[in-house]
Amino acid sequence: MSGLFETLGRRALFTFDAEQAHGLSITGLKTGIVTCRTPEDPALSVKVAGLKFPNPLGMAAGYDKNAEVPDALLKLGFGFAEVGTLTPRPQSGNPRPRIFRLVDDKAVINRLGFNNEGHEAAFKRLSRRAGKSGIVGVNIGANKDAEDRIADYVAGIRRFYQLARYFTVNISSPNTPGLRNLQAREALHELLSRVLEARDEEGNMCTLKRPVFLKIAPDLTDEELDDIAAEADAQKLDGIIVSNTTLSRSGLKNPENSNETGGLSGAPLFERSTVVLARMRERVGPDMPLIGVGGIDSAETALAKIKAGADLVQLYTGLIYRGPGLPGEILRGLSTAIKHEGVSSIAELRDRDTKEWAARKLIS
């Protein structure tokens, strides 16, 4: 399926503007004609933050921004799907064009700016799937013009508490001015304190404790990673997602579109994000869940993330270039890897290569 898509489907979709092509793919999933379900392998099941995932492969936030197709994504074989980023009020994001393909590099640069229809539109859609099986997380953000950005994150926790299986606090998008400043220790302390307080208050009212993950940038210094790890431990955060898109342009094969402002995702992000993942694993120790994101486009890259320290992995850009058959292809490859490695579950392969990845040097 992936090979056929690369030959025919991608050629057709790539005749459209990147944002139009994205809209067409959402429409295709809504029709239900795109399904590539892969038989479940119990050896791929992973328990993370109190949730049992049927497999470790998830759809990253940014694709289904408005919670339109989470169940269709699960039918592609994903073990979980993350919708958003959602802000309290609708916002249009940055002016178009704002998505740029770097085809030779199997990469994308975007400067979307949290364009979404807001909490209420997504709430209505997610309410319609209440009671359905499948893990759907909600990625929450802040409106660009918010006077109190932390209050926007708190609002997201409260609005979606009954519907989200987990939350991701996104403070690492490079496309909202000043947002990444929330990763600094003092600001992060206030953010996590208020968000987790809201989570605990909501949880106490319904006896459900929803995990909260923090999504960080791949462009952080070792000292900044130290601060985030320390704060995550002190606040008893449920996990960290490593990582969002990068501002770095190192290693690109083709300069076309590389000077565009925005975050770079796809294959060139793999090395940087995996190194930062491993370094974060060394800092937080074996118990805190980590979700690896960035450059996953095969079973080999997914397995490398797990061996570098990830409990779960997510992809997005790989799907653009490889098509809807990619999740199944990755899961089959991971099942084969488990047998080849002589272990009984994918979780046993975590951290096999953490030290080697953490020691690699990064080019800015």
Swiss-Prot record:
GO BP of this protein: 'de novo' pyrimidine nucleobase biosynthetic process; 'de novo' UMP biosynthetic process
Enzyme nomenclature, EC number: 1.3.5.2
Name this polypeptide is given: Dihydroorotate dehydrogenase (quinone)
Annotated membrane topology: Peripheral membrane protein
Reaction(s) catalysed by this chain's protein: (S)-dihydroorotate + a quinone = orotate + a quinol
CC cofactor note: Binds 1 FMN per subunit.
Cofactor list: FMN
Recorded family membership: Belongs to the dihydroorotate dehydrogenase family. Type 2 subfamily.
The protein's assembly and partners: Monomer.
Role of this protein: Catalyzes the conversion of dihydroorotate to orotate with quinone as electron acceptor.
A GO MF term: dihydroorotate dehydrogenase (quinone) activity
Gene3D superfamilies in the record: Aldolase class I
Binding site for FMN: A61, G62, Y63, D64, K65, T85, N139, N170, K215, S243, G266, G295, Y316, T317
Phylogenetic placement of the source organism: Bacteria, Pseudomonadati, Pseudomonadota, Alphaproteobacteria, Hyphomicrobiales
Active-site residues per Swiss-Prot or TrEMBL entry: S173 (nucleophile)
Location within or outside the cell: Cell membrane
Transmembrane domains' residue ranges: none
Gene: pyrD
EC primary class: oxidoreductase
